[in-house]
């Protein structure tokens, strides 16, 4: 679907109060929009905070998948080779030192070895935002893009993570100066993004802690809540509204336009739907997510996992590399 067709359809369906699922890739070249039942016929299923188009979500097929998933399973990621990461990081650091960017997310695909199928991962995950696109990819994301309820738009940027099992983990995370600097930067960026589409933008909550479960254990994640006020006719302009804020600031960086160009140069390949967005309009409100924690099927029995890392001007190459490699393996 072309960009203009997506905008036209999104505006028309939202304006008429017709529920739909939407998906937009990171590069804003692939635009998908389906009624929930049509998405299901195409093998595209979502579960967004318990709302789903999977027919067996209350039992039946979905329950069968949960029941047959092994209590112990293999899930191993092979992190990107550090020399490759270091080369990209050096390029990013050069741009940061030249003032072209001051916050940039850098990510690479990593092979995943698992005895779980994509559909099993979809059902087994406890993430609030889940998406299964046939045998192409699965997303189990903790990160909201935007929510819209009434005339209020909200975003919840996530920046700052630590292993919850570490001693005094919460204090260490909240008092880390580097984490604070990054979080301040992304909050400012998201506030600016919301200001392009909303009035009276404000930070409603600053740096609160969420707990995220992974198969390796629990993580502490720092988020903030930013909100603004939309005009009464926002549904009839939902397509333009979404696209004006893309790509998501939390997975690109600041300043956004220049940083996106640096990402393309450093990573050397397209992200596709990874770090794009997906969401639902339920006839009145919007719930959407950033497509992080993403596994893609690239061949028979071959999966590639992707998750985000981060680099800033005061980061040390070795530390940031280990952090990104660790996040990709979770």
Question: Locations of the language-model features?
Answer:
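Extended alpha-helical targeting/anchoring segments
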Residues: 1-330
């Amino acid at each position: 679907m072309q960009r203009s067709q997506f905008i036209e359809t999104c505006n028309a369906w939202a304006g008429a109060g017709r529920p739909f699922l939407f998906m937009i890739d990171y590069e804003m070249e692939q635009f998908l929009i389906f009624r929930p039942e049509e998405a299901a016929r195409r093998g595209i299923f979502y579960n967004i905070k318990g709302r789903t188009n999977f027919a067996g979500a209350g039992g039946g097929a979905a329950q069968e998948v949960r029941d047959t998933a092994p209590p112990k399973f293999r899930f191993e990621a092979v992190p990107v080779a550090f020399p490759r990461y270091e080369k990209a990081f050096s390029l990013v650091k050069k741009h940061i030192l030249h003032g072209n960017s001051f916050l940039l997310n850098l990510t690479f695909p990593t092979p995943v070895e698992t005895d779980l199928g994509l559909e099993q991962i979809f059902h087994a995950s406890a993430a609030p935002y889940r998406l299964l696109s046939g045998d192409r990819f699965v997303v189990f994301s903790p990160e909201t893009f935007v929510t819209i309820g009434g005339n209020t738009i909200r975003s919840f940027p996530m920046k700052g993570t630590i292993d919850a099992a570490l001693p005094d983990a919460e204090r260490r995370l909240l008092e880390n100066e580097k984490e604070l600097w990054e979080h301040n930067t992304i909050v400012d960026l998201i506030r600016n993004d919301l200001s392009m589409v909303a009035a009276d933008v404000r930070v409603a909550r600053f740096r609160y802690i969420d707990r995220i479960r992974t198969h390796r254990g629990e993580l502490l994640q720092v988020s903030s809540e930013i909100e603004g006020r939309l005009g009464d006719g926002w549904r009839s302009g939902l397509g333009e509204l979404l696209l004006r804020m893309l790509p998501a600031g939390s997975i690109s960086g600041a300043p956004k336009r220049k940083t996106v160009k640096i990402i393309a140069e450093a990573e050397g390949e397209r992200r596709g739907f990874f770090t794009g967005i997906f969401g639902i309009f339920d006839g009145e409100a919007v719930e959407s997510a950033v497509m992080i924690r993403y596994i893609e099927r690239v061949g028979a029995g071959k999966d590639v996992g992707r998750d985000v890392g981060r680099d800033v001007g005061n980061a040390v190459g070795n530390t940031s590399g280990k952090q990104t490699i660790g996040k990709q393996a979770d």
